[in-house]
A protein has these predicted regions:
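Short loop/turn motifs that connect adjacent beta-strands in outer-membrane beta-barrel proteins
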Residues: 120-123, 146-149, 170-176, 252-256, ...
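Carboxylate/His-rich catalytic cores and anion/metal-binding grooves
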Residues: 251-292, 406-408
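Bacterial N-terminal signal peptides
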Residues: 8-19
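N-terminal periplasmic/intermembrane-space "pro-region" immediately following the signal or transit peptide
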Residues: 21-240, 249-255, 652-653
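Signature for the C-terminal beta-barrel architecture of outer-membrane proteins
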Residues: 334-335, 353-543, 556-563, 568, ...
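A conserved hydrophobic secondary-structure block that centers on an alpha-helix together
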Residues: 256-257, 304-365
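Outer-membrane beta-barrel transmembrane domain signature of Gram-negative proteins
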Residues: 281-319, 342-346, 423-429, 433-458
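Outer-membrane beta-barrel "beta-signal"
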Residues: 401, 604, 615, 632-653
């Protein structure tokens, strides 16, 4: 392949050189003998000789011209002879076996050319405007190296996927895609070296924001049972009344090292849940937790809830880049799934866990395997869960592999295991390895012993740009199953989120429609009383961190869906309408629950660096075991975010 590429390059070079010589006029022939210099002994001045018309007379070498020689002559103009134009040289944008070298735009900067990148960078938070922009480019048929189901992305991996698609975007007739590309590259400008100089130190405030959220009416804040009025919000506190948060984030990058801190002050007023005793009794029976409870529990919002005024680290981690991996420690976002409204395995519905992460941030080609499955990315993390009482202090680890066999299709396998806990099994290297590698069914005596491999949840997902309409329609599926090797092996027992996105409505190209349906209540006898998906018999608070489901907000034994209609004003501005519906099974929550939400959202920029995000939501919900009749609440939110430019310097020579 390399020899063929070298021969192709040499042939192109020879062709270009021969064409250049063919278009260069021939020089006049040199005289056979130069006349002697007048200063030499016996030399005489040269005598001019007549020349044919249409040629240039020769000038004597080093001779002193006489006045007669200095008289101007007017030769006839020379008419250039047209040279035949060679065939155009077309180099493909992507390597092929016939042409292994990809094309670059004219005068391409160095950073566009592929090469080894040893520098590290911080992750972009999953609630950033960057992800809707990247997703829109992906669903328009660009960003062939984007892994939709594995978020977040680092700043540099985002830059690489954008540069890999730059020529396709720039040479397309899609002006909206070009605008999105320009805004994203401006966001990442600190990562882009100038000329041949590598990026040096990058530091500064990444964002600063304040949010005012007023809620009028009774709310739901019970992720593990009845439902949530506010979801996918990092498990932040909220109650009826005025809720306020203000925060900032900082980024520091130098060579392979990076540091990111995002902290915020949060305020939520006091509230009262007042779950009736019959409801608490039934929920505790289904959860297999003794009632009355020994003390406050995060999964049961009961009694008077005090006002909350914490300062909390939303994200905080240090990382080092090693051979295409980010190895990090701390609190980092995770959104493992292709869905827009939720992710079955991991989302930002709950507070992030403190964990050790190993993330392959750049696609990896594995010999032989990648010929069949395409480039692969993988992610692993392990950390401790908080807010658990039965059992206290369990740990969790997650492993994911995602493949792209074609530019239109991505699929992934993921596995989460919750193991250990006070009084059950110690968290040691031995118990970790046992939980990591064990895929066998677990008998009751083993489950309740120190050899318990843990609660195992397996996920399978894919995204597919549909044939013939790949620039318009994207199909996604995300599934999870409890105690199965993979949802593919037991599809009837799995929970699903599936949907379709229409990126451009015919006649209104900036209008986008997205619909997703979700269920955690499969039609099997095992799904009863909430004791299946997101639940576990040993770690009884199940798939939660500080009381909130870590996966999809739909929760346990429920069905629902979401729909979004979005009009894109620009690359980072939009108007969006959303509808949400959820129904919880009656055998889990007595009488069941029903939620309907209608939401209008506007994201607008003032200048380049100030973003306004304002939205209004109406919710009507029914939970007869909690409150009789239809309950209504309205939420109005205004958030201002400032995105200052990071300071950056070139690397030292």
């Amino acid at each position: 392949m390399r020899i063929r590429g070298s021969l192709s390059f040499a042939a192109l070079t020879l062709y270009a050189v021969s064409t250049a010589f063919g278009q260069t006029p021939a020089s006049p022939s040199a005289p056979a003998q130069a006349p002697p210099h007048p200063a030499s002994p016996g030399a005489t001045a040269p005598v001019p000789t007549p020349t044919p018309a249409g040629t240039i007379p020769e000038a004597p070498a080093y001779g002193v011209q006489s006045p007669s020689q200095q008289q101007p002559q007017t030769p006839a103009p020379v008419v250039p002879t047209p040279q035949p134009k060679g065939p155009p040289v077309t180099v493909p944008e992507k390597p092929t076996s016939e042409a292994p070298f990809a094309a670059y735009p004219s005068y391409a900067p160095v950073e566009q050319k592929p090469g080894f990148d040893w520098m590290g960078s911080t992750y972009i938070p999953v609630d950033s405007w960057v992800y809707p922009a990247l997703t829109r480019l992906y669903e328009m048929g660009f960003l062939d190296t984007m892994y939709l189901g594995m978020r977040p992305y680092t700043r540099r991996s985002t830059m690489h996927m954008l540069l890999a698609s730059k020529s396709t975007i720039v040479n397309s007739d899609n002006e909206e895609a070009q605008e999105i590309f320009a805004k994203l590259m401006n966001e990442l400008s600190a990562e882009i070296p100038s000329g041949n100089v590598d990026r040096g130190l990058v530091y500064g405030m990444d964002s600063s924001y304040t949010r005012f959220m007023g809620i009028g009416g009774p709310i739901l804040r019970d992720s593990f049972h009845l439902g949530q009025t506010i979801s996918n919000d990092y498990g932040r506190p909220y109650q009826s009344g005025l809720n306020v948060l203000t925060g900032a984030s900082t980024t520091e990058e130098w060579g392979p090292f990076s540091l990111y801190v995002r902290g915020e002050y949060q305020h939520a007023p006091s509230g009262t849940a007042n779950y009736p005793v019959p409801l608490l009794t039934q929920l505790s029976v289904n959860d297999e937790i003794p009632f009355p409870f020994a003390g406050p529990m995060d999964i049961y919002p009961i009694g008077t809830i005090a006002a909350q005024n914490p300062f909390r680290l939303v994200e905080a981690y240090a990382s080092v880049h090693v051979l295409g991996h980010e190895i990090s420690g701390g609190k980092i976002d995770s959104w493992l799934g292709p869905g827009f409204g939720g992710a079955m395995a991991w989302s930002n519905n709950a507070e992030n866990v403190y964990a050790l992460h190993v993330d392959r941030v750049e696609p990896l080609n594995i010999k032989y395997l990648s010929k069949l499955l395409g480039p692969v990315r993988y992610d692993f993390f392990v950390g401790s869960l908080k807010g658990h009482t039965y059992l206290n202090s369990p740990w969790v680890h997650s492993t994911m592999f995602s493949f792209r066999p074609t530019r239109d299709f991505e699929f992934a396998f993921q596995r989460t295991v919750i193991w250990g806990g006070e009084g059950h099994a110690p968290v040691t290297l031995h118990t970790f390895l046992h939980s990591f590698f064990d895929t066998n069914d677990t008998a009751a005596d083993e489950k309740l012993s120190r050899n318990d491999p843990g609660a195992r949840f397996s996920d399978f997902s894919f995204s597919y740009l549909l044939p013939f309409v790949r620039k318009y329609a994207t199909l996604i599926l995300d599934s999870i199953s409890h105690d199965d090797v993979t949802p593919i092996s037991a599809p009837r027992r799995a929970a699903y989120r599936t949907g379709v996105a229409i990126s451009q409505i015919p006649g209104i190209p900036k209008l986008e429609l997205r619909v997703e349906a979700v269920t955690t209540d499969p039609g099997v006898a095992r799904s009863f009383a909430g004791q299946f998906n997101y639940w576990e018999i040993v770690q009884k608070e199940g798939y939660t961190n500080k009381g909130f489901i870590m996966g999809d907000w739909i929760g346990r034994e429920a069905k629902g869906g979401q729909a979004w209609l979005t009009y894109h004003l620009s690359g980072n501005e939009w108007i969006q309408l959303e509808y949400l519906n959820k129904k919880t099974a009656k055998d889990f929550v007595p009488g069941g629950t029903t939620q309907n939400q209608f939401k209008a959202d506007v994201v607008k920029r003032f200048g380049k660096d100030v973003e306004l995000n304002a939205w209004v939501q109406y919710e009507g919900w029914k939970a007869p075991a909690y409150k009789t009749g239809l309950q209504k609440n309205t939420t109005a939110t205004v958030q201002l975010t400032w995105y200052p430019k990071l300071h950056h310097y070139p690397a030292l020579p």
